[in-house]
Amino acid sequence: MEPTADHDDNIAQSPSTRANAAADDGGPLHPWMPVTFASRSPGSRVFPSAVVHGDSLYIFGGHDGGVYRNDLLVFNLETRVWLLDLELTGGGPSPRDAHAAVVHDEWMYVFGGYDSKRYLNDFHRFHFDDLAWSSVPVGGGAPSPRGGHTAVVHAGEMLVFGGCDGWNYFNDLYARAAPPTQAARTAAILFSPTLSHSLSQVQVQL
């Protein structure tokens, strides 16, 4: 069983947290504001991934009340226009949600997720300029199948943390170079096992 959520097709933005986000100066937070779309929106879905590359937001997968998806939606942050019918090559990942995606150079990397029947640990990448998907060999030492994990890129490595496989909750941390090489599990135990969390990098810390 994966977590449930209400569906909403809204996007909200905040200009920043504070003038100096690295220092808690005690100042007021900037308010969130709904984003107005200048075109037809894609509709509601839960547990997709979202990354930013250039001036666009790329949203992959998710589900909308039982239908698991593997489409790629692009929202131009300058024009506020959705691109919903991109002609992609390479096939791409199978429909899923609760996966993780990161950006490194001209690629988006997608790992794992849940497809309504099983948890996954496959690995795919998407080239932004060529609009092409390709699968990446998982290799030895890869994380076990999971969903609800998080990922970031630091110093040329994709770091994957946590998640669950329906029975077990994880607090392991894996690193893999991008471009991909064999994954390696780190020795650090960071937090209690967790899923559906968030992860970000601030300088050299997660």
Mark where each language-model region is.
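Kelch-like beta-propeller repeat domains
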Residues: 1-206
